[in-house]
Swiss-Prot record:
Family under the similarity heading: Belongs to the phosphoenolpyruvate carboxykinase (ATP) family.
Binding residue positions for Mn(2+): 212, 231, 268
Name this protein carries in UniProt: Phosphoenolpyruvate carboxykinase (ATP)
Function: Involved in the gluconeogenesis. Catalyzes the conversion of oxaloacetate (OAA) to phosphoenolpyruvate (PEP) through direct phosphoryl transfer between the nucleoside triphosphate and OAA.
A single GO molecular function term of this UniProt record: ATP binding
PANTHER family: PHOSPHOENOLPYRUVATE CARBOXYKINASE (ATP) (PTHR30031:SF0), PHOSPHOENOLPYRUVATE CARBOXYKINASE ATP (PTHR30031)
Species annotation: Salmonella arizonae (strain ATCC BAA-731 / CDC346-86 / RSK2980)
Keyword hit for Acetylation: no
Binding residue positions for ATP: 212, 231, 247-255, 296, 332, 448-449, 454
Main location: cytoplasm
Cofactor note: Binds 1 Mn(2+) ion per subunit.
Cited SUPFAM superfamilies: PEP carboxykinase N-terminal domain, PEP carboxykinase-like
Amino acid sequence: MRVNNLTPQDLKAYGINDVQDIVYNPSYDTLYQEELNPGLEGYERGVLTNLGAVAVDTGIFTGRSPKDKYIVRDDTTRDTLWWSDKGKGKNDNKPLSQETWQHLKDLVTHQLSGKRLFVVDAFCGANADTRLSVRFITEVAWQAHFVKNMFIRPTDEELVNFKPDFIVMNGAKCTNPQWKEQGLNSENFVAFNLTERIQLIGGTWYGGEMKKGMFSVMNYLLPLKGIASMHCSANVGEKGDVAVFFGLSGTGKTTLSTDPKRRLIGDDEHGWDDDGVFNFEGGCYAKTIKLSKEAEPEIYHAIRRDALLENVTVREDGTVDFDDGSKTENTRVSYPIYHIDNIVKPVSKAGHATKVIFLTADAFGVLPPVSRLTANQTQYHFLSGFTAKLAGTERGVTEPTPTFSACFGAAFLSLHPTQYAEVLVKRMQAAGAQAYLVNTGWNGTGKRISIKDTRAIIDAILNGSLDNAETFRLPLFDLAIPTELPGVDTRILDPRNTYASPEQWQEKATALAKLFIENFEKYTDTPAGEALVTAGPKL
């Protein structure tokens, strides 16, 4: 459907020449036929599963490649961006020269020239005042399918005068042979130019680079306008009460916000402005490893026609083995948000959040399943962003390792972490919001805290019973822990009880406390950061 009659001439403006044909904003039926075309080879080819969803493989790139991320350093970004080569903070915002950018752009536009291309126009951001109009250009049908699922699909009327604010050119099939001379990490690249407002992708087929690329852009633009930009899921209760769930990949954002008792706003990326919380996306990107119909029925039932599975094992009879992590632990599915029945309609936005939940998967088994945070502890734990990096969401990670990721999303932050903390705190104070730290990870038994217990904890937060519960303080971390909660095994609330002896917990807790203190040193170069030290662990 060529609503705005995009022509090869239009693509010439981006340096893409001699385009054979443009498949503009293809329907799901068109994408289905394109992906299953028997003439396709390699990673372009989709496989039909018995659930109705198409499955694709993304090759060796089964997660993002943060070491291959670059941003052009110019007058727009020089003094605003959080650069990897400045300050104490560790991040992936490596500077790129204008010359190298032009070389990468030439590679991608050459790759896309002379081809039959898929062009998808979509929105990033459910708030019309601040959303980005994004044009995605790719030669691969399933990549067009991915962005159609994940971003907000414009109406026919909105497409008539669609003018892109940002262009994403995906040249997954091309690589950069001159990477060594240019001082880059590898032949693959995910590069941004915030002056030209273009993202380039080369070498990696992973769909998540397009999703998280736009998240990085929103993370640059919104906080500068005083709008919180958050790596979180969000939902709303029957009384209009909004909760947001911060957390890194695999900590439970999608699972815990997909709740039959509450309507989903979104599962991963949100803004918080003067009107309330709004989704950046039009879809969900759920992990499927060990997915079961019983434990996560909403996500399981969302995997049907128009959903797109990534890197799962499909048996000869078309059934999916969700337990098989042989390709990667980071198996995924993208689906349009309306595949979940219980969502906020027609626009994925709601009022101001009153509950802010920080999800962590503690591989040490030290932190309690839930604690109520003071205002200073809220800032401390937001800036710390502690979790265990779970297997598979980045290449080369197979065992859980502790990690600190500022604002529970350092990989996607374009500004200094304190800028996100300042905006979030202002929004929380204005809304009278309360924060909680929820450990969805392990305890002294060596087992992961069950989804059943975690869901009961979330229920207690959302219905207010946790705020009324009697609490005690956990030593070292000074966290307020409830003595009992409805539906939760009381023995697990105090993590010390899950160890053979309190000394075992003390030993592990001391080791983790040291890591927290070392990590937070990077924020102590400002008076505001120094003031927060007392909100962290004390040895």
